[in-house]
């Protein structure tokens, strides 16, 4: 999960839509932008989805403004089971993803990124 506090002038953050287009993420003062990781999709049975995102030189706003990013990445223990949270299932609904360990999930993501490159 990434939580961003952005100014209106900073711009440049884009998210990819399900149909493959890149769109600017609109921000307002006092609001946060939250990007979720792929494991959150599995935990929530796609109620919360991971969005591919990128940062580009802004077309509007102050492209020369200063930015500061602090990344902090947290990952469950390698052998932790990742499965749908029961409260994310409606009556009669089944999980869309099989249970997997966090380590196996990350291994598959790394393999997929190498195949795509």
What are these regions (language model features)?
Residues 1-117:
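C-terminal flanking tails of non-heme Fe-dependent oxygenases
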């Amino acid at each position: 999960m990434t939580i961003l506090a952005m100014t209106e002038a900073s711009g440049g953050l884009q998210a990819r839509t399900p149909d493959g287009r890149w769109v600017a993420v609109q921000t307002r003062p006092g609001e946060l932008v939250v990007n979720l990781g792929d494991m959150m999709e599995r935990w929530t049975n796609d109620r919360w989805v991971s969005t591919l995102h990128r940062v580009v030189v802004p077309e509007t706003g102050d492209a020369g403004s200063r930015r500061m990013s602090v990344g902090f990445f947290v990952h469950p223990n390698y052998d932790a089971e990742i499965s749908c949270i029961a409260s994310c299932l409606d009556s009669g609904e089944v999980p869309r993803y099989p249970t997997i360990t966090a380590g196996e999930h990350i291994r598959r993501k790394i393999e997929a990124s190498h195949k795509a490159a």
